UniProtKB/Swiss-Prot annotation:
Protein name: Uncharacterized protein HI_0219
Localization of this protein: Cell membrane
Topology within the bilayer: Multi-pass membrane protein
Membrane-crossing segments per the record: 26-46, 112-132, 136-156
Main localization of the protein described in the UniProt heading: membrane
Cysteine disulfide links: none
Keyword Hydrolase on entry: no
Entry GO terms, CC: plasma membrane
InterPro entries: RclC-like (IPR007339)
GO BP of this protein: response to hypochlorite
């Protein structure tokens, strides 16, 4: 048994010696990963389907709802129940419904999406720039952290983040907290972005302080 443990420990030390000197490269990889996600998702905000697809987040968020004209308004549905107006004008991805698109134009959905997308792409660029410029990278990392906090708040403000109880032939056993829907499962991953942003920011902060020595 001692022989096996010795071999195992030797292997672990061998791997550690390879990985340890690459810490800076791995942190740069975090920056690249954050940039890819930010640039891709932020860039897609100019697309109609993506702008429509964030309406539930924006309408329910205290940070963003002011960007919409109608989305947060309460209106009666076909059953006479009061619901947020955006719920009556959802466009499934890949489906074009003219009356819904017109409503989103009047709502300011697309303008808001362009603004949000530009902010996301800018944060991604600043984070990536941390590879070469510590000050820009510090700003980008902290903004990534802050943006992740806002995104994670959608778990609290967005009803669609949790599996609903839609009924059926049998009782629904798993709905509400802690049962994340597809929307919620997408949002919860921003915890990784939060950690990555802080890691990138801390490395830039150390480089800035090192200049003073």
């Amino acid at each position: 048994m001692e022989i096996y443990m010795s071999v195992f420990n030797t292997f672990v030390e061998f791997v550690a010696r390879i990985v340890a000197p690459m810490q800076r490269q791995f942190i740069n990889f975090i920056r690249i990963a954050i940039f890819i996600v930010m640039a891709w998702i932020g860039g897609l905000k100019v697309c109609q389907y993506e702008a429509d697809g964030i309406a539930h987040f924006v309408s329910n968020s205290p940070f963003f709802s002011y960007m919409y004209e109608k989305g947060p308004n309460l209106v009666p549905n076909d059953k006479g129940e009061l619901v947020m107006e955006y719920t009556l004008h959802k466009n499934p991805e890949g489906k074009m419904v003219a009356k819904n698109i017109e409503w989103h134009k009047e709502n300011g959905t697309y303008t808001a999406s362009y603004i949000i997308g530009a902010i996301i792409v800018t944060v991604g660029i600043l984070t990536l720039a941390g590879i070469w410029n510590a000050t820009a990278g510090l700003a980008g990392g902290l903004l990534t952290f802050g943006m992740s906090i806002v995104t994670l708040s959608f778990l609290i403000t967005t009803p669609e983040a949790w599996v609903p109880n839609l009924g059926g032939d049998l009782p629904t056993p798993a709905y509400g907290f802690p049962y994340l829907s597809g929307v919620g499962r997408l949002v919860i991953k921003d915890i990784i972005m939060m950690a990555g942003g802080l890691t990138a920011a801390a490395e830039c902060a150390n480089r800035i302080l090192a200049r003073k020595k």
